[in-house]
Amino acid sequence: MELSVYNIKGEDTGKKVVLDDSIFAIEPNDHAIYLDVKQYMANQRQGTHKAKERSELSGSTRKLIRQKGSGGARRGDINSPLLSGGARVFGPRPRNYTFKLNKKLKALARRSALSYKAKNNEIIVVEDFNFDAPKTKAFKAISAALKVDEKKVLYVLPEVNKNVYLSARNLPNTNLILANLINTYTVLASKNLVLTERSVAVVNELFKA
């Protein structure tokens, strides 16, 4: 698969870049995507939720009313789950939500997500980002030139670039990621992907089947 390469002014440079078909042109596996996104979301959870059960509450254990004869429901002490302010039955306990997936499935999910983006023409390739100093205004102009300024966009960089990061961090709907850290969730969470030529080379090398 070939895509045109644009400059930061949004102009077609006439150059082409090759996207590896084993990454960007496979038949997407929706179930692999589902499992990988589910794992990503689960791994973000802290799992620190906690509600006190009956044995953990302080307070009197005196029975509030006698067992029979009142005409009302039976009830025990003030911590009874039947009462307002009482304990909770089977409340949440601290737990670890993380789970593992095998590497082949995660790789398939990542390639499936990238193939969806390529199939929907949601991948843009630019020559490079050159910033001598952090300039949010300049980065915003690039987004406008590429016509992605009103959409959620993920910029894929080949390496850490402090000036690019500082220029983009305050822009809404704009995220940055290193090419070697691309994952299924971040790809699908954005409408468009913007890669540099070097980013494409990194992705082609690391993720080819």
UniProtKB/Swiss-Prot annotation:
GO molecular function: rRNA binding; structural constituent of ribosome
Function field: One of the primary rRNA binding proteins, this protein initially binds near the 5'-end of the 23S rRNA. It is important during the early stages of 50S assembly. It makes multiple contacts with different domains of the 23S rRNA in the assembled 50S subunit and ribosome. Forms part of the polypeptide exit tunnel.
Highest taxon in the source lineage: Bacteria
Keyword entries, A-Z: Ribonucleoprotein, Ribosomal protein, RNA-binding, rRNA-binding
Keyword RNA-binding (UniProt): yes
The protein's assembly and partners: Part of the 50S ribosomal subunit.
The family this protein is said to belong to: Belongs to the universal ribosomal protein uL4 family.
GO annotation, cellular component aspect: ribonucleoprotein complex; ribosome
Annotated InterPro entries: Ribosomal_uL4, Ribosomal_uL4-like, Ribosomal_uL4_dom_sf
Keyword Ribosomal protein: yes
Lineage, broadest ranks: Bacteria, Pseudomonadati, Bacteroidota, Bacteroidia, Bacteroidales
Protein name: Large ribosomal subunit protein uL4
Region (Disordered): 45-80
A GO biological process held by the record: translation
HAMAP family: Ribosomal_uL4_B
Disulfide bonds: none
